[in-house]
Amino acid sequence: MTKSIEQFLMKIQSVIGSKVIMDSNGVIEEIHIVSDLRRSPKQILRDVEAILISEFDQSVDYKKISIAQVKGDSVKTE
């Protein structure tokens, strides 16, 4: 289920990366999002919460969701 949630989160406008961490019972422990600067973190957070509830029937405390914004539209790795 982790991969399907991550793939769905990638459909959110401005999101360029996502990682979902679940415990052994399938409960979401952490969500990490990387986005560009076109939308505010608050807007992205609300979209994440809405998708989790509407598509996956999971409610997550907003404190478990972290959003890092980067300039540009991709994360560079070296």
Where are the regions that the model predicts?
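Non-catalytic alpha-helical coupling and interface elements of nucleotide-dependent molecular machines
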Residues: 14, 38-39, 49, 53-61
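Short amphipathic alpha-helices in soluble, non-transmembrane regions
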Residues: 5-8, 44-52
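N-terminal start-of-chain detector that recognizes signal peptides
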Residues: 1-6, 37-40
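A short interface-forming secondary-structure element
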Residues: 25-47
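Short edge beta-strands and adjacent turn/loop segments
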Residues: 3, 7-32
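A sequence-level detector of short, solvent-exposed, charge-rich linear segments
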Residues: 24, 28, 47-50, 67, ...
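A short amphipathic beta-strand at an alpha->beta junction
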Residues: 36, 56-78
